[in-house]
């Protein structure tokens, strides 16, 4: 299988940089997969789990929004936050969700809508984590 270069960058670190076979990305308009030779494309990311396949192994990384650019040079993702599942503290993640739920009653209007959307994304990630743990 042909490979391409992939960079995943967050404000804190370069989370990944290297040659890969495929990257599955949680796009705002729907999830999409990237292979070598993909057409140029720019997309916004939603919070979700990014799957990187390289050399027959998969690495899963949580991203909390950002921007993806596919060009002839490869795929670059600028993520608001990028955390490998290996680094994730699932107890702290669950506590974050509980805190978000508790603060919903303090929000109104558009702020409430955004808070609910973010909470839904976090709950979806948590559900995916629980499903991943079973496999």
Swiss-Prot record:
Q: Name one Pfam family in it.
A: ATP-synt_DE_N
Q: Which SUPFAM superfamilies does this chain map to?
A: Epsilon subunit of F1F0-ATP synthase N-terminal domain (SSF51344)
Topology in the membrane? Peripheral membrane protein
Key word Transport present in the record? yes
Q: Does the keyword Cell membrane apply?
A: yes
Recorded hits in PANTHER family, A to Z, give:
ATP SYNTHASE DELTA/EPSILON CHAIN, ATP SYNTHASE EPSILON CHAIN, CHLOROPLASTIC
**Protein family per UniProt:** Belongs to the ATPase epsilon chain family.
Name of protein: ATP synthase epsilon chain
Taxonomy, top ranks, is:
Bacteria, Pseudomonadati, Pseudomonadota, Alphaproteobacteria, Hyphomicrobiales
As recorded in Swiss-Prot or TrEMBL, the protein's gene is named atpC
């Amino acid at each position: 299988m042909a490979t391409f270069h992939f960079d995943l960058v967050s404000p804190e670190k370069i989370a990944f940089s290297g040659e890969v076979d495929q990257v599955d990305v949680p796009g705002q308009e729907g999830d999409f997969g990237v292979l070598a030779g993909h057409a140029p494309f720019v997309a916004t990311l939603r919070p979700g789990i990014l799957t990187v396949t390289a050399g027959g192994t998969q690495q899963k990384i949580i991203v909390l929004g950002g921007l993806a650019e596919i060009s002839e040079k490869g795929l670059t993702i600028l993520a608001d936050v990028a955390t490998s599942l290996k680094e994730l503290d699932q107890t702290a993640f669950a506590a974050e969700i509980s805190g978000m739920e508790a603060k919903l009653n303090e929000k109104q209007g558009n702020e409430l809508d955004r808070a609910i959307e973010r909470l839904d994304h976090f709950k979806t990630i948590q559900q995916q984590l629980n499903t991943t743990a079973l496999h």
